[in-house]
């Protein structure tokens, strides 16, 4: 579980690279705020596949989803600085969105099957990795840009790829379907009494995500446009998500 939590941390560190360097990307590619909103939406489009990935995770071994996802996210987000056009930038973000779905949806399934009777502790470490990454990520990418420039962000590639390599050697022979067979089979049906609860929860999550995404994506850009330094803008985002 510790390895998965560390992989979750590294994955989400890379996935938080966009907002802190948006002011630089806007200057480089000449993007309007509308275009920034569009590419941010493109990054989140693969989340529409969450229900289907979840259904798949309930039926097949998910270990390769978790093994591949950190590598995909690392590659796509480390190359943001050298994207030559808005189209290439959007493609990189779309790939990152797919890899994020492949990691975050099966991740809790993986934890549940490995944690045994300590599911709560397993999920707490898993979530800690993700939450901490949102604070550290902006500082990591700004440090890289300070050292190597915007187009030197690709030098962060090895660290994230290391996570996928470790996950492969640790879990490629772990057959979670066998672990699942030791538990009573669930019917897979949601009781009718819970449907209203899930619909309300879905609505709350949807509108909360809209507000949070708009704020976190544009905060560094807004601060930079109003005279703040790039470091202060990124640090404010880190503090907000701490």
For the regions a language model picked out, list residue spans one by one.
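Central cavity-lining transmembrane alpha-helices of secondary-active solute carriers
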Residues: 40-54, 238-242
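MFS-fold secondary transporters
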Residues: 76-81, 96, 167-168
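Cytoplasmic helix-loop-helix junction between adjacent transmembrane helices
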Residues: 92-129
